[in-house]
């Protein structure tokens, strides 16, 4: 379990440049933990909870492909299994053979998982380096998303 508890409360609206830089650095450092022997495309994600807790995740591939999991879902599932339900942001990076050369966006399945647990203004930070990132909201990357309220 890779979790750090902090006292400060953070939301998507109060996220600071320093916090973003910290998430970017952790994402870049965590890429070495990816298990991608088939695609050789390594991905790392760092999820920031509203209470300041941080959960990491990596893509974990499987020879049968279907059981593989993306880094973003890995981080979310770790957090949710630890009773977290309030999320502020996620930073992610990825690259062939673990070398980050460009921005890496979440796949559609990961966007849908984020939609299950996050507000439309949830921040998704695509990391290229500690100083180069792009920030999107969930509603920008998944407009008109289907969520729990659609089933009420």
Describe the function of each predicted region.
Residues 27, 45-46, 75, 79:
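Small-residue (primarily alanine) positions within well-ordered alpha-helices
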Residues 2-5, 150-152:
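N-terminal charge/polar-biased segments
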Residues 40-49, 125:
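Short beta-strand scaffold segments in enzyme catalytic cores
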Residues 56-150:
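Zn2+-dependent cytidine deaminase-like catalytic core
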Residues 21-36:
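Short, basic/aromatic recognition patches
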Residues 3-25, 129:
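Short, compositionally biased leader-like segments
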Residues 38-40, 69:
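Short glycine/proline-enriched turns and hinge-like loops at secondary-structure junctions
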């Amino acid at each position: 379990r890779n979790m750090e508890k902090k006292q400060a409360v953070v939301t998507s609206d109060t996220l600071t440049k320093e916090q973003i830089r910290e998430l970017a650095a952790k994402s870049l450092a965590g890429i070495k933990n990816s298990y991608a022997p088939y695609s050789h495309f390594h991905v790392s994600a760092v999820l920031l909870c509203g209470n300041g807790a941080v959960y990491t995740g990596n893509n974990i591939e499987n020879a049968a492909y279907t059981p593989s999991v993306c880094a973003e879902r890995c981080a979310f599932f770790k957090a949710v299994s630890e009773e977290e339900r309030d999320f502020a942001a996620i930073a992610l990076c990825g690259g062939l053979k673990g070398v980050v050369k460009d921005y890496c966006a979440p796949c559609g399945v990961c966007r849908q998982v984020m939609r299950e647990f996050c507000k439309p203004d949830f921040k998704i930070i695509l990391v290229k380096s500690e100083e180069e990132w792009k920030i999107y909201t969930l509603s920008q990357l998944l407009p008109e998303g289907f969520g729990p309220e659609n089933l009420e």
